[in-house]
Regions:
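Hydrophobic protein-protein interaction segments
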Residues: 102-308
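Recognition helix of helix-turn-helix/homeodomain-like DNA-binding domains
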Residues: 31-48, 55, 72-73
């Protein structure tokens, strides 16, 4: 084994050992076979495609800086704007498995959600605010400016993923329902308790963007609830005849958080485990019972959201 092969082998071996995922999970998320990953670990592949390296790095939960390190070890240039489509394409190959898959970093979490959102089917969102993909262009870059400052690609990458998620949302609404459940107190605090003037303007635009979707798409059902859910989660339910299992993405958002400052924090989990999904369906049953009936009237709902965002 040459020195260069040894470096590649050691880098991949260390990354695999640090990963909380099994080999099968890494293969499922990256779209690479176990056999290919074993050859990478041995340093036995002389010319590894850039796209495969990035997909592998995403599955390993590497930060953007760590992905740069991997690319350099494999004699590739650091990440650049031209690589953004590769991250988007990685969401097409990624598969969510029955194991509980931990996800670190906002951009990796977004890719996991996008991979689920690409599957046609009914969509449930339980959160304290409108769907994150409805944030205006530039909001992510501001709210996560510390991460944007840490890596030159970060802001453009998360905005590009957000655009693709909005595109998938619109496409899905053509044939399937999207049901969002939002705690009215959390949503009110999201706007009124924000002390950062610029962030508040971004949040107001976020709510107005939700109003535009509610006004334009009958299949977008937005419910205000009295109860604050235990978890924030997204559930995708493909048609029964599709043969595709339901997908679940879980996260917890600290109510006081304004700026995301640290890379590497646990962002959430993804799974298609039936038993886990059944528990969240039971949670959804309780959430439905707390829907505020006054705002089932679509115009009253819109009026409330417009007033809140002014």
């Amino acid at each position: 084994m040459t020195t260069r092969q040894q470096m590649k082998s050691e880098f991949v071996g260390t990354a695999l050992k640090k990963s909380p995922l099994s080999r099968n999970q890494i293969a499922a998320v990256s779209g690479l076979s176990n056999a290919y990953i074993r050859e990478l670990e041995k340093g036995g592949i002389g010319n590894v495609g850039r796209e495969k390296l990035i997909a592998f790095a995403i599955a390993l939960n590497l930060s953007l800086t760590e992905i740069d390190d991997m690319l350099r070890v494999f004699d590739r240039a650091a990440l650049a704007e031209d690589d953004i489509p590769v991250f988007i394409q990685a969401s097409e190959r990624s598969r969510i498995s029955a194991a509980l898959h931990p996800i670190r970093d906002s951009f990796t979490f977004d890719i996991a959600i996008l991979s689920a959102e690409r599957i046609p089917g009914d969509h449930v969102i339980v959160s304290p605010r409108p769907a994150s993909c409805l944030r205006a262009e530039g909001h992510r870059a501001y709210a996560e400016k510390s991460l944007a400052a840490a890596h030159r690609l970060y802001a453009d990458l998360v905005e590009a993923i957000n655009r693709e998620r909005r595109k998938q949302l619109m496409a899905n609404l053509a044939d399937h329902a999207v049901r969002q459940f939002v705690c009215i107190n959390c949503l009110t605090d999201y706007i009124r308790e924000c002390t950062d003037a610029e962030e508040k303007r971004w949040r107001q635009r976020h709510v107005r963007n939700a109003v535009n979707i509610i006004s334009s798409f009958e299949r977008y059902e937005f419910y205000l609830t009295r109860e604050c859910p235990s978890f924030i989660f997204v559930m995708r339910t493909p048609p029964p005849d599709s043969g595709i299992s339901e997908k679940l993405i879980i996260t917890v958002l600290p109510p006081h958080r304004l700026q995301v400052r640290t890379s590497g924090l646990l962002a959430g989990f993804a799974t298609d485990n039936h038993a886990v999904i059944l528990n969240f369906k039971e949670e959804l049953t309780f959430i439905r019972e707390s829907i505020i009936e006054d705002y089932l009237d679509r115009q009253k709902l819109i009026d409330f959201l417009v007033e809140l965002s002014d």
